[in-house]
């Protein structure tokens, strides 16, 4: 009987389930969206029951579309939107909505903590204190949900990120992995344990915390009434770390970029815990008794800039049109677009930056705007890669995400980086990474060497641009960024006058 691995890919807007075989081929997919809830401006929540319902339906659809029986599934891997914070009781019943990673309700609280404890938090967790991470969200829940802190003190509350909630519902086990724990701002990435000083700082009782395990081991077995079989749940990693694993980036210096609404770039630093002023240090995964680390750069707006061309100023109807428009021009004739709609992420970290389009003349048309948008994505990626290069030597960039279908963008990315950009055959690298981690735990795959041999390039984009042109274009980009930075402060100052 042929066996398969099931990957659960729980994102910010939808829950997906994908079934892979030993050669990494996809046999079945299920996907269901779930609603976002916005109770106040800047607040973002999910209903955990809606997440669970969407995930369970996606699993059943994937099994059905693959035309297999549940007992043909050798293992289940979980990957998830990171940082999103949930609390539930011992019966698995949610005690409040999930507070989503995008939610800014704790921004002021974190700013106060950052002023006094920012350096200490960065040294312990590798993270720059921000409302993005789980610690302040959990503190808010304990302080604001009636009766929750009292229940927590009695050991009746369980906290976790989305992976932990799904694994608890599937198996009854309260666990997470190193990669997800490292995004809570409560986990000491050197000691590999919850940090007492941080728990005290955020006033969080240890009893609510899950057990932290490796990213590839059997955490438990699915309850038979759910799927009709007891299947080992044996892989767990946050979405960006799972994508790094799915790209078979197992050695130091191997880097991947995921192009989505924003972009995330991770470089494997292996056993080295490296610190950068402008990048996050995080755990990539725990495997076979050792932990691998990574540096991460988060870019807030990339694909969202293309969506703005479509939905905001309506100069395109489909994202794919940008490639055709961009290739109509031999050059962009000095037009730059800095898509700092919500500030700039790595390596600038300027929340007061705002979007600008600069270099416009009477001859500027929608071709220039489309091209400037795609070029901005590549420039922003180079900004992060250059920062990584200060600490780690980088030879090539492996890419995934929807925008990788755009050949103009991929070629320009190779040109502006002066490095190969490699697009893999299997585009579902996040789900594939979780599947690999699950399969390794049950000997479905032997080791990472076998997985590295399975990874195949669909196309390699070689740099073609001469150095003089490349550096002239990039210098123009850096000048454009300077003009975008701090713009919200300029506007506020003008208002107050």
Curated annotation (Swiss-Prot):
Pfam families: FGGY_C, FGGY_N. Sn-glycerol 3-phosphate binds at residues 12, 82-83, 132, 239. Gene3D superfamilies: 3.30.420.40. One of its GO terms (molecular function) is glycerol kinase activity. InterPro entries: ATPase_NBD, Carb_kinase_FGGY, Carb_kinase_FGGY_CS, FGGY_C, FGGY_N, Glycerol_kin. Coiled coil: none annotated. Optimum temperature is 80 degrees Celsius. CDD domains: FGGY_EcGK_like. Glycerol binds at residues 82-83, 132, 239-240. It comes from the Archaea. GO terms for cellular component: cytosol. SUPFAM superfamilies: Actin-like ATPase domain. Pathway: Polyol metabolism; glycerol degradation via glycerol kinase pathway; sn-glycerol 3-phosphate from glycerol: step 1/1. HAMAP family: Glycerol_kin (MF_00186). Homodimer. Belongs to the FGGY kinase family. It is not sensitive to fructose-1,6-bisphosphate (FBP). This is Glycerol kinase. It comes from Thermococcus kodakarensis (strain ATCC BAA-918 / JCM 12380 / KOD1).
């Amino acid at each position: 009987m042929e066996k398969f691995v099931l990957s659960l890919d729980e994102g910010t807007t939808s829950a997906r389930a994908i079934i892979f075989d030993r050669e990494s081929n996809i046999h079945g997919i299920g996907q269901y969206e779930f609603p976002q809830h916005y109770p106040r401006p800047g607040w973002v929540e999910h209903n955990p029951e809606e997440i669970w319902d969407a995930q369970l339906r996606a699993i059943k659809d994937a099994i059905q579309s693959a035309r297999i029986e549940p007992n043909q599934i050798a293992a289940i891997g979980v990957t998830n939107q990171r940082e999103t914070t949930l609390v539930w009781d011992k019966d698995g019943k949610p005690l409040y909505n999930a507070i989503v990673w995008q939610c800014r309700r704790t921004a002021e609280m974190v700013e106060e903590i950052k002023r006094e404890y920012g350096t200490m938090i960065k040294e312990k967790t590798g993270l720059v204190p921000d409302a993005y991470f789980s610690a302040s969200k959990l503190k808010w829940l304990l302080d604001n949900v009636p009766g929750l802190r009292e229940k927590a003190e009695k050991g009746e509350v369980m906290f976790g990120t989305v992976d932990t909630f799904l694994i608890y519902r599937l198996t009854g086990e309260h666990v997470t992995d190193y990669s997800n724990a490292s995004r809570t701002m409560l986990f000491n990435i050197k000691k590999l344990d919850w940090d007492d000083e941080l728990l005290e700082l955020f006033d969080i009782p240890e009893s609510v915390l899950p057990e932290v395990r490796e990213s590839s081991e059997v955490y438990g077995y699915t309850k038979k009434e759910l799927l009709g079989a007891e299947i080992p749940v044996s892989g767990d990693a946050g979405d960006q770390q799972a994508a790094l694993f799915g790209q078979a980036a197992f050695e130091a210096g191997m880097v991947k970029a995921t192009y989505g609404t924003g972009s995330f770039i991770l470089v494997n630093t292996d056993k080295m815990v490296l610190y950068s002023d402008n990048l996050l240090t995080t755990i990539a995964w725990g495997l076979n008794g050792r932990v691998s680390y990574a540096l991460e750069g988060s870019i807030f707006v990339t694909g969202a800039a293309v969506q703005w061309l479509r939905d905001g100023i309506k100069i395109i109807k489909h994202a794919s049109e940008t490639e055709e428009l961009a290739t109509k021009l031999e050059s962009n004739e000095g037009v730059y677009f800095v898509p700092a709609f919500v500030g700039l992420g790595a390596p600038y970290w300027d929340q007061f930056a705002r979007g600008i389009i600069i270099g416009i003349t009477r001859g500027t048309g929608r071709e220039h705007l489309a091209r400037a948008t795609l070029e901005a994505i590549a420039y922003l990626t180079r900004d992060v890669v250059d920062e990584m290069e200060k600490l780690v030597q980088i030879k090539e960039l492996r890419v995934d995400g929807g925008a990788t279908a755009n050949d103009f963008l991929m070629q320009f990315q190779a040109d502006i980086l002066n490095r190969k950009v490699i697009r893999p055959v299997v585009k579902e690298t996040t789900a594939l990474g979780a599947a690999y981690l699950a399969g390794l735990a049950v000997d479905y795959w032997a080791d990472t060497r076998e997985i590295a041999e399975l990874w195949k390039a669909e196309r390699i984009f070689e740099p073609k641009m001469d150095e003089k042109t490349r550096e002239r274009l990039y210098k123009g980009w850096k000048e454009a960024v300077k003009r975008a930075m701090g713009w919200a402060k300029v506007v506020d100052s003008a208002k107050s006058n």
